[in-house]
Amino acid sequence: MIDRRTFIAASAAGLSAAPLAAQSALAVRVGFVPVIGASALFVLAGDGSAREAGLNLTLSKFDSGPNAIQAFASGTIDLLVIGVAPVAVARSRGFETTVISAAATGGSAFAAGPALAKAFADNGNDPAKAFAAFRAAQGRKAKLGTLPPGAVPTVALHHWLWKVGKVDRADVEIANMGIEVVQQAMLASAIDGGTLLEPSVTLVIERDPRIKRIVNSPGMFPNIPGVVVAASGAFLKSQAPAAERFVGLFRRATEIVAKDPAKAAPHVLAALGGGLVAEATIARALASPAISYVNDPKEIRAATEALLAYQVELGDFATAPSTEGLFDQALYERAVKSAGR
């Protein structure tokens, strides 16, 4: 059963004031995972620009990639804002979909609890030395929390530990858990460190200043693709102009997120905050060094291939899904041209 929460991205007041063209807007079903890299979606849905452009967006939140892909493949979602790897895998299994825009690279960071943070501080932030020192001092491995296998933050963690930091595997223990569970475990000191997605990493450090940000995504796996916009083959065949319009709006919204986080924050808070996060915290998370905002698919192509290749090494799949035809560069460029850029 798909675990999702659906809401319409327009208020009743907005509907009553909408122009005639907007009232006959095309219904577009958009799925998303609740991460900061999807923020442009929340802006274009929340500020009314989508409806003004003739798109009536219905947003569906998915708490995991597999559930989102299941809905996407079943035909109940037209567009999906999610990590690139699940899209590539779905395509390799016969589902017709392409990436029509990038959204962000990175988006996560590794944070350490008090004891592990001290080990890093005492050892010049050298991962191998820090984890070895922690084990010597505590008499046990450092327990690290991260998302399930295959998730981008999890891939980034493994790459940082084994490829960048050359950490001894005997010094760490990795526990896979959900997005919100990692945050809760850090605050409860149930784990010694973990990979946290924004805005969780900003929130956790604000709530417990003893927790320290050790390394951001760029230092874990350079240019690692965070989030993309994928369209179903059926939607592209029947509504290609709408897909192009969406990409143009998404690009405009991305500029707002990158250049004016305070302006974007209320819309992102409405989608991600759940009433428990301050708007200022969201604004700081949007400006986090853990994330970069990018829309042009060609800018993430090489990093996507590197990501998928490393996932084979991790055992996430036997062979890397092909990226041939994965990115619809032509549609993206038409959208940019139509938007007058």
Where are these regions (language model features)?
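Short, well-ordered beta-strand elements
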Residues: S24-V35, L55-S60, A142-G145, I174-A175
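A conserved helix-loop-strand patch within extracytoplasmic ligand-binding domains
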Residues: A103-A175, E180, G233
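A bilobed periplasmic-binding-protein/Venus flytrap-type ligand-binding module shared by bacterial periplasmic
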Residues: V43-A45, A109-F120, P225-P241
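Pocket-lining segment of extracytoplasmic ligand-binding domains
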Residues: V181-A271
